Amino acid sequence: MKKKIALIALAVTTALFAACAAENTPSAVSQQESSFAVSSEDKVTALTEESAKETVKLNMPIADKFYAIYNRCSLPVDNSASVTDDNGFCYSPVESVYDTLASLKADTEKYFTKEYLDSTFYKNLADETAFYKDINGKLYKNTDAVSDGKNIWDTTACVISDITDTGFTATVPYLDLYDAHRSAKIEYLLDNGTYKINSWTLNLDAI
């Protein structure tokens, strides 16, 4: 009887050992790691998307401010000190934290890539009708180029796509100055540790 019990115990022990060994075979460990990798990847993706939405939420009011500065000449000026340049355009000294063109550019480049700026905003500084320029060491604005309007951005409804290690794309709905509902596709690029706008395309079709 004792011999029979001993044999049964030995058989159970052998079976348990075999099961444990099977769980620790390369294929089993690989399956466990694979399962962990998938769940971890899902978690990272979710966090990255949430982080991207937060970036858009914080960034859009600032980005829109610069859009208005460069495209609508929105910086306040002292009209009592206006001058007329050699091309016949009226310029007034800017009354803001930006006292020179260099200081304006330095702040702008915190939020936009240089490549984007050179192909968009900075083009409005380049010729004889420049929207802004330094006169006698101070920033002046072309008051003949002023336009009105403001876009209202709904960052709570933005859609994030194309997430990579170096950036993402955000589609953000907005209400334009004509009260038309539209959207913009904005590409953010990681530049020296900061997500900056590298592309900004306005969809002019009403939605």
Annotate the PLM regions.
Residues 21-23:
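Bacterial signal peptide processing site
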Residues 1-5:
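Positively charged n-region of N-terminal signal peptides that target proteins for export
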Residues 11-13:
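Repetitive helical segments and hydrophobic/amphipathic motifs
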Residues 27-207:
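Mature, Sec-exported extracytoplasmic domains of Gram-positive
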Residues 16-19:
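C-terminal motif of bacterial Sec signal peptides marking the signal peptidase cleavage site
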